[in-house]
Amino acid sequence: MLTRRITLGISRNLSRGALINARFASSQSYLDSVANLKKDLKKAMIAKDDLRKTTIRGLLSGIKNKEIDAQGKDLDEFALHDLYSKLITQRKDSIEEFLKNNRSDLVEREESEIEIIKNYLGQLPVASEAEIDAKVSNLLTELKQSNPSLQLKDAFKKVDWKAAPSDWRASASMIKASIVRQFKTKS
């Protein structure tokens, strides 16, 4: 029994160390965003703004879960963008369900949470979906001019995936989704 406790204690300490290292390896804008959330949480607690406090705690919880899942990998503003977008989508789905069940009080709360999350989403130094779509559209137009029988896999090969996130200010998943969307409409 004693060895079991010692083993569990060591594994807990190692996982905490990995989590701390994940934070230090993250980008500066990621760290600034998390610090801003914590500062805003404190302000919401002082102002007794329950809705904002609960929403920010949910965001911080999602970020913490993302850090744990990353297991030491670098996290950046694109990971936050994906997380915030996912949370907004979840709330929109909840609104649909609440409308079906005539729960207007919960609909208003979810809409307010969406506005709070969109505020933090807008603060991230990430390109908007329209900006990404415009760049992808230009890229596909150039590629189709040089090769009229362009396939989707060829379009993916032409993108420098190591440099694209920093050059385009977008995550690879956002760029890939835009390429697929634009390719279908241009074909």
UniProtKB/Swiss-Prot annotation:
> Which keywords does UniProt give here?
Mitochondrion, Transit peptide
* Signal peptide (residue range): none
Put simply, this protein is called Altered inheritance of mitochondria protein 41, mitochondrial
Q: Please provide, in alphabetical order, the Gene Ontology terms of the cellular component aspect for this entry.
A: mitochondrion
An example Pfam family from this entry, by short name, is YqeY
User: Which family would the database say this protein is a member of?
Assistant: Belongs to the AIM41 family.
Transit peptide: which residues? Answer: 1-24
UniProt GO MF annotations: carbon-nitrogen ligase activity, with glutamine as amido-N-donor
Stored SUPFAM superfamilies: GatB/YqeY motif
Compartment(s) where it occurs, according to its Swiss-Prot or TrEMBL record: Mitochondrion
